[in-house]
């Protein structure tokens, strides 16, 4: 320290530069002895490329690599079991195959009270003959749809049950019983899907359904009026819209 006090500023700068170059040379030599030029604390923490200075690094980096890449697709094999969970609901809510209907009699019971359970249906129809299946239709949340399927081993037993219970009230609601055939099965599916959307006449929204019906009435009335069909464009107020657009355009031109 005493020597630097006697030296000039330029000499001190030159001395510092010479010391830095000497330290750099020593650092390179130590790196070669250790087996790596990029070892040290950086290699220990971040998993560097060092040799002897980063001996514990490969063991720490291996678990990180094993969690990604190859092992990631393994959890995606679990969704293959999801269809098995919904298989029971699909068979309960749907209808059987054609071969199953030919061997016995199948009844479709509708307009049921939502409190009627599977046990109630089985107890009600078991007195007419042996049953293959008697179950209420439920949605995925467990709520009753108000319909049920009753499978008899013999078609004659199904006809007896239909004649006996069709129109008879159960828990305050009259049962509607039909013998399921291929034609009834094909007709019931679109009716059920449309009834959930708010009716057959308006499956896609109320205003659109009424507009379509109104156009049909106008067409039938305009046939006897000759040129009455030309009045429909006036009801759309297209001229007023054009006038409004023209006024807006003129206003923009005036301001500019």
Swiss-Prot record:
Biased composition regions of type Polar residues, renumbered to the chain: 186-195
Domain spans labelled RRM: 105-182
One Pfam family it belongs to: RRM_1
GO terms under cellular component: cytoplasm; nuclear speck; nucleus
Main location: nucleus
Gly residues compositional bias, start-end: 32-54, 196-212
Keywords, sorted A to Z: Chaperone, Cytoplasm, mRNA processing, mRNA splicing, mRNA transport, Nucleus, RNA-binding, Transport
InterPro entries linked to this entry: ALYREF_mRNA_export, FoP_C, Nucleotide-bd_a/b_plait_sf, RBD_domain_sf, RRM_dom
This protein's record includes keyword Ubl conjugation: no
MF term (GO), any: C5-methylcytidine-containing RNA reader activity
Domain of life, source organism: Eukaryota
Renumbered residue ranges of the record's region Disordered: 15-85, 186-256
Alphabetized SMART domains for the sequence: FoP_duplication, RRM
GO biological process: mRNA export from nucleus; mRNA processing; RNA export from nucleus; RNA splicing
Biased composition (Basic and acidic residues): 15-26
The family this protein is said to belong to: Belongs to the ALYREF family.
Subunit relationships: Component of the transcription/export (TREX) complex; TREX seems to have a dynamic structure involving ATP-dependent remodeling.
Protein name as annotated: THO complex subunit 4-B
Annotated source species: Xenopus laevis (African clawed frog)
Taxonomic lineage: Eukaryota, Metazoa, Chordata, Craniata, Vertebrata
């Amino acid at each position: 320290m005493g020597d630097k006090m006697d030296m000039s500023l330029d000499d001190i700068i030159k001395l510092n530069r010479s010391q830095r170059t000497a330290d750099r040379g020593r650092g390179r030599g130590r790196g070669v002895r250790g087996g790596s030029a990029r070892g040290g604390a950086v290699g220990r923490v971040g998993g560097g490329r060092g040799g002897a200075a980063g001996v514990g690094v490969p063991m720490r980096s291996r678990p990180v690599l094993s969690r990604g890449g190859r092992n990631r697709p393994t959890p995606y094999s679990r969704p293959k079991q999801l269809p098995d969970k919904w298989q029971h609901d699909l068979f309960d809510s749907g209808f059987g195959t054609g071969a199953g209907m030919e061997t016995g009699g199948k009844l479709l019971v509708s307009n049921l009270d939502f409190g009627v359970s599977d046990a109630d249906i089985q107890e009600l129809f078991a007195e007419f003959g042996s049953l293959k299946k008697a179950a209420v239709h439920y949605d995925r949340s467990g709520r009753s749809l108000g319909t049920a399927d009753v499978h008899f081993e013999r078609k004659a037993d199904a006809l007896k049950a239909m004649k006996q219970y069709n129109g008879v009230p159960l828990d305050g609601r009259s049962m509607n019983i039909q013998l399921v055939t291929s034609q009834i099965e094909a007709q019931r599916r679109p009716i059920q899907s449309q009834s959930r959307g708010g009716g057959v006449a308006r499956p896609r929204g109320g205003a659109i359904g009424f507009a379509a019906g109104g156009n049909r009435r106008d067409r039938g009335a305009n046939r006897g009026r000759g040129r009455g069909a030309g009045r429909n464009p006036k009801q759309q107020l297209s001229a007023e819209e054009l006038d409004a657009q023209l006024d807006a355009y003129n206003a923009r031109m005036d301001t500019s």
